[in-house]
């Protein structure tokens, strides 16, 4: 967030995003909230003040099933090293949960992550990327500006 919209530079962005979260247009995943709250910065303060209209508990049955499928995909896919599975298997890592939820509820994931265009079984990667794994499950990923346009968020 500091790269694109620091709080002191774009307070209107954060207020509009808070409104979209309050009215349920943007869902908040408990694992993502927990990740943010582990920090000690303005984003943590902002998160603590939010009214969340659509809060998703990652332990819901359909999500747990999809989560297992996501991890199984990484485990069985020869383009990934064991390190990719080890990283994504940590419960505090939000990436596989985001994909599991997006599959379960037909959501779009907003991320700055880029696909790994060099994935190959000859040179497996230790890092799974959201866009690559999401695509396997038919989940759409988009950038922040897509979301801003969809929600009608304006700067200035």
Outline where the language-model segments fall.
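Active-site-proximal, substrate-binding regions of enzyme catalytic domains
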Residues: 1-107, 115-119, 135
């Amino acid at each position: 967030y500091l790269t694109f919209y620091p709080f002191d530079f774009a307070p209107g962005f954060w207020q509009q995003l808070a409104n979209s979260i309050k009215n349920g247009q943007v869902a908040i995943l408990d694992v993502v909230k927990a990740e943010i709250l582990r920090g000690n910065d303005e984003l943590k303060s902002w998160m603590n003040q939010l009214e969340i209209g659509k809060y998703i508990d990652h332990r819901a049955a359909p999500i747990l099933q999809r989560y297992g499928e996501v991890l199984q995909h990484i485990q069985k896919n020869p383009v990934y090293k064991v390190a990719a599975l080890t990283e994504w298997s940590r419960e505090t890592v939000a990436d596989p949960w985001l994909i599991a939820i997006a599959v379960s509820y037909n959501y779009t994931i907003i991320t700055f992550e880029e696909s790994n265009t060099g994935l190959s079984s000859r040179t497996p990667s230790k890092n799974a990327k959201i866009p690559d794994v999401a695509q396997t499950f038919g989940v759409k990923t988009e950038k922040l500006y897509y979301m801003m346009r969809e929600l009608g968020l304006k700067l200035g």
